Amino acid sequence: LHIHYTGKTAHMIDADAISQYLDSDKFTVGLSDPTSTRHIVMNTTHEILSDPAVRKALQHATDRQTISDGIFYGLEQPADMLYATTVPYCNVGLKPYEYSTETAAQLLDEAGWVLGSDKMRAKDGKQLALDLLYNSDSVTEKTIAEYLQSEYLKLGISMTIHGEEEQSYRDNMKAGNFDMVFNICWGMPYDPQSSLAAMRAPVYGDYAAQQGLEDKAEIDDAITKILTSTDETERQELYKSVLTNLHEDAMYLPLTYECNKALYTSALHGVHFGTDQYDVPFADMYFE
């Protein structure tokens, strides 16, 4: 029995390799529901990213469908929200930021970031220049970063990208030493409660990146109430408040929904995914 199983902690098989088996008769590819969300965190204390209009422009300038199809072969679906609607409490009717370079350009124009003769945007003599930090151990993050760099350039946004080895990348993220940085939600069964709770303290980059939000105190207060409330209706309303604020603040740039992937011989039956990303129900698998 040989099963290749890739989840958050095991990337032995990437999307490129799995895609080669999608039309195979001998092997079957299994995909779970979304387990976590691949996204970019924008630092709201940054001089340029402190402006919600710039953050919203980047949301509209990001073609998630092309990232899903071109980089993940459709194995990871485009993400419109920080948490998938299948995550408990997270189906709260948020409106996605539709991909529209026209909307992105309009937002930047109205915010004073206008195109110069060099086709780059500037405001009061300052260029619209950002930096994106990625984990150099992740080929995928580098590929996405290079794609976004080229796409944003078409709008007159200068974005440098740089990778750091995992520990340095994590240290800088936690300290808030970034303009923009790749991140992944905690995933099931920790989302949304545990990952939101961690935003109230400098555990990861969220805390530092949220310091420029006008509604930071309001968000933290609602999260604290979620942790103590035993009334399900109240909890749902509090979650809706937090998720709506974070979505409208536009500091989280969702890219794709990560899922667990299984590649196995088609003679094997009973292969399915467990209730969380680390649960592999081997006991249910069998050969006839």
Predicted feature locations:
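Ligand/substrate-recognition segments at binding pockets and active sites
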Residues: 114-187, 260
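Append "and occasionally in soluble cytosolic enzymes with long acidic Gly/Pro-rich linkers
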Residues: 30, 49-150, 241
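Extracytoplasmic "Venus flytrap"
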Residues: 134-142, 194, 208, 212
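Extended ligand-binding regions for polar small-molecule ligands
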Residues: 45-69, 219-236
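Bilobed periplasmic-binding protein-like "clamshell/Venus-flytrap" ligand-binding domains
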Residues: 69, 111-134, 181-185, 229-266
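Extracellular/periplasmic solute-recognition and catalytic clefts
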Residues: 1-46, 57, 69, 184
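Short, solvent-exposed loop/beta-turn-alpha elements that line the ligand-binding surface or hinge
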Residues: 18-35, 41-51, 88-109, 116-128, ...
